[in-house]
Amino acid sequence: MNDIKYKRIMLKLSGEALAGENGYGLDFKVVKRISKEIKELVDMGVEIGAVVGGGNIWRGRNGEDMDRTTADYMGMLATCINAMALQDSLEQLGVDTRVQTAIEMKEVAEPFIRRRAMRHLEKGRVVIFAAGTGNPYFSTDTTAALRAAEIEADIILLAKKVDGVYDKDPHKHEKAQKFETLTYIDVLDQGLQVMDSTATSLCMDNNIPILVFALDAPGNIRKAISGEKIGTIVCKE
């Protein structure tokens, strides 16, 4: 317990991260690896909330000719598929896990109830929040920020395919510069690709730090909660 800097965390996993190199669907090898890393944290006594995206299955913006609200609801359902896959993988490792959804589907998951979520965390269960906020026009980044505030998380761990925040796309620009630290205002003013502006503003208003790091490097989640210098930290000062 001595090397834990953050006792209660919100882990934000993109749908693309769960797809691995396939880019679509679920790569169960990746899901299992992530689950093992989460189990390691649970065994250390870290309380974990998680939000999963749905971009590996559906993105609202993909439905160009669709009603935006309908397309967004389809995206929310996609996050539920990912949440159930992660839950199953964690439970196979013996980790007690609950899925809570913002849209009621009582046959497969609990509805989101803040007090119940807090109780699960206190009992050492992982809580996966799915179906976004339950409202269209809000991203899963905003869901992560909102749920982090509601469960009083110490930090949001934003797992990406890149090892931090850069001034340019590092995949396209060899000389892209990585930031070690940023303020919320930096992110908003410069339009940096961390979270969308709604999510960033919510984190700023509630003083929730955001750590952006690469998910594909084994052990990075453990390093993150231990306070080791990885990725990019976004905070007040």
UniProtKB/Swiss-Prot annotation:
Catalytic activity, as annotated: UMP + ATP = UDP + ADP
Metabolic or biological pathway: Pyrimidine metabolism; CTP biosynthesis via de novo pathway; UDP from UMP (UMPK route): step 1/1
Its EC number(s): 2.7.4.22
One GO term describing the cellular component: cytoplasm
Region (Involved in allosteric activation by GTP): 20-25
Binding locations of ATP: 12-15, 55, 59, 166, 169
A biological-process GO annotation: 'de novo' CTP biosynthetic process
Function: Catalyzes the reversible phosphorylation of UMP to UDP.
Protein name: Uridylate kinase
Species assigned in the record: Clostridium tetani (strain Massachusetts / E88)
Organism lineage string: Bacteria, Bacillati, Bacillota, Clostridia, Eubacteriales
